[in-house]
């Protein structure tokens, strides 16, 4: 989600296939987000006259599933911690990396990103889209990933499962969830 944000990121979904060598079977993880709890037919009828919201608004979004997928992968098959797995991404988000042509082109061509001040701040620093090779930073994303690591570290004494769960729960039930809502 750092170097190729259009492919996958902390606010997105994931569909993952795993070969579980021990069980000798393919396992599928479907981390496609669910609709928010209050997104009911009645709510849309009352608030939007029964119309569906535009596809690029929060009203059409789902709860991001990717952090739960990371948790599931690490908890069931992993040996590393969130801290170990996320450290390279945190370093790139905060320190920057040379942006590739594909991501630079996607940013430049995106009208949706330009509609939201928070996206403009990240993707159009100085008011301009980055060019391929420019150093691109996303410190806000780095801070979000650090929060997952902090939550995990706070629960390390309770065991691996509880520590991983604490990171996931901070995203879905803690301050990160409240900031997104």
Model-inferred region functions:
Residues 1-181:
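Noncatalytic scaffold domains of N-terminal-nucleophile
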């Amino acid at each position: 989600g750092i170097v190729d944000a259009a492919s996958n990121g902390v606010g997105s979904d994931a569909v993952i296939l795993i070969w579980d060598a021990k069980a000798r079977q393919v396992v599928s993880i479907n981390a496609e987000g669910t609709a928010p709890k209050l997104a009911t037919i009645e709510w849309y009828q009352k608030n939007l006259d029964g119309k569906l919201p535009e596809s690029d608004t929060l009203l059409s979004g789902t709860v991001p599933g990717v952090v739960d997928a990371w948790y599931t992968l690490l908890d069931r098959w992993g040996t590393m911690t969130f801290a170990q797995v996320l450290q390279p991404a945190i370093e790139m988000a905060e320190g920057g990396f040379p942006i590739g042509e594909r991501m630079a082109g996607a940013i430049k061509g995106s009208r949706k990103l330009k509609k939201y001040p928070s996206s403009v701040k990240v993707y159009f620093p100085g008011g301009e889209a980055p060019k391929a090779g420019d150093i691109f930073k996303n410190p806000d994303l780095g801070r979000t990933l650090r929060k997952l690591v902090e939550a995990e570290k706070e629960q390390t004494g309770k065991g691996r499962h509880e520590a991983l769960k604490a990171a996931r729960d901070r995203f879905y039930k803690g301050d990160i969830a409240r900031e997104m809502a």
